């Protein structure tokens, strides 16, 4: 992030060009993906806007056991279908500014379209995520964290409609 007065501004830009190579035992591969994430924050608040576009003849290829940094790779969906275009809006708040250190939250909405949906329909999907996290700041349970993640997906692709809740308990051990 780059501070400008009281504001903090930032951007992540990524471009992936994936092409087949060698004997093409897995078939042909032709994909490019552009990912843009811009954000502005002041005080406890941060607003993020993202755009992602998939081009070429295939969906974005994932290497086994890897997670690429692309803006719309989120809790359930990744918005990487062939020809998919997706937009994201996200709002974060850090409640330390309001006297509750350790409490953070965000809400995010991503919508994608332009791909082939089920039964030849024009593909459309969206995901809404809510994330609330609290880390104990002092006492015998210091650094113990609890996070609730809720995701709602609506899609006319093979995933369909899905609602998911995750409760994550973590404990951070300082090394220094």
Segments (PLM) and residue ranges:
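Transmembrane beta-barrel domains of outer membrane proteins
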Residues: 1, 38-41, 92-96, 133-137, ...
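Short loop/turn motifs that connect adjacent beta-strands in outer-membrane beta-barrel proteins
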Residues: 2-9, 96-103, 137-146, 174-176
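Residues that define the transmembrane beta-barrel architecture of outer-membrane proteins
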Residues: 7, 30-34, 83-87, 124-128, ...
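Transmembrane beta-strands of outer-membrane beta-barrel proteins
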Residues: 9-13, 36, 45-49, 89, ...
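Transmembrane beta-strands of outer-membrane beta-barrel pores
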Residues: 15-19, 42-44, 51-57, 95, ...
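Outer-membrane beta-barrel translocator domains and adjoining extracellular loop/strand segments
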Residues: 18-30, 59-64, 115-123, 156-163
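C-terminal structural cap/anchor segments
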Residues: 54-120, 127-133, 137
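Outer-membrane beta-barrel "beta-signal"
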Residues: 89, 130-136, 161-176
